Amino acid sequence: MKAKVIDAVSFSYILRTVGDFLSEANFIVTKEGIRVSGIDPSRVVFLDIFLPSSYFEGFEVSQEKEIIGFKLEDVNDILKRVLKDDTLILSSNESKLTLTFDGEFTRSFELPLIQVESTQPPSVNLEFPFKAQLLTITFADIIDELSDLGEVLNIHSKENKLYFEVIGDLSTAKVELSTDNGTLLEASGADVSSSYGMEYVANTTKMRRASDSMELYFGSQIPLKLRFKLPQEGYGDFYIAPRAD
């Protein structure tokens, strides 16, 4: 496999986000593109990242399916070295993954491949009563502001408006999002409510560096789905299970 990433900074933030949930992962490489998926150790979050071949400026595969196992910590330690104008070339053989930054000067790093057990993805064929579309930066800024106020994020919808609420020990914070005030691009669905672990939701906000817009789906006592849209119809999906209490 050989793939050239023009926006290496954005790519690095995608993998940093994955690294907040998983310690090890596989690049599943086919002629269609690269997929990374997995379930976090607490089994609260299932993530599914897909970067189509058109996401890359150059994309070469030598076999029908290639599985590239790696430790997120090792890859992210390298990706933290990326500079603003760098391009990134990913290449692999049977034993190693090579990351090459090409910018003002060229730097190459090699990592040994590891065996990562493939996880069976859960069934995510869900009917979501409510859907909203918004800018990723809007979502990330709101969650960042609320994240230190409490451990539980309450989400509810009413009359096509979306509400984020956190009840802390000393105060309660509530944010209204709607198409009227410009915080939602689109919204439709039923009046529903559910609660999710704030830490899991907050760990997705690094995607703002890679994604301009996103979709949010939820319903009463079903997983929250966050779809971060990526260039060339790529996406980053995060399914977060509701809190039981």
Curated annotation (Swiss-Prot):
Gene Ontology molecular functions: DNA binding; DNA polymerase processivity factor activity
Keyword DNA-binding: yes
Pfam families assigned to the protein according to its UniProt record, in alphabetical order: PCNA_C (PF02747), PCNA_N (PF00705)
Entry keyword set: DNA replication, DNA-binding
BP terms from Gene Ontology: leading strand elongation; regulation of DNA replication
UniProt keyword annotation of DNA-binding present: yes
Subunit structure: Forms homodimers with PCNA1, which then recruit PCNA3; does not form homotrimers. The heterodimers interact with RfcS homotetramers. Heterotrimer which circularizes head-to-tail (head is at N-terminus, tail is at C-terminus) to form a toroid; DNA passes through its center. Replication factor C (RFC) is required to load the toroid on the DNA. This subunit interacts with DNA polymerase I (dpo1). The heterotrimer also interacts with flap endonuclease 1, DNA ligase and XPF via the other subunits.
Similarity comment text for this entry: Belongs to the PCNA family.
Annotated PANTHER family: PROLIFERATING CELL NUCLEAR ANTIGEN (PTHR11352:SF0)
Purpose: One of the sliding clamp subunits that acts as a moving platform for DNA processing. Responsible for tethering the catalytic subunit of DNA polymerase to DNA during high-speed replication. Heterotrimer stimulates the Holliday junction resolvase Hjc. DNA polymerase I, DNA ligase and the flap endonuclease may be constitutively associated with the PCNA heterotrimer forming a scanning complex able to couple DNA synthesis and Okazaki fragment maturation.
Name this polypeptide is given: DNA polymerase sliding clamp 2
Species annotation: Saccharolobus solfataricus (strain ATCC 35092 / DSM 1617 / JCM 11322 / P2)
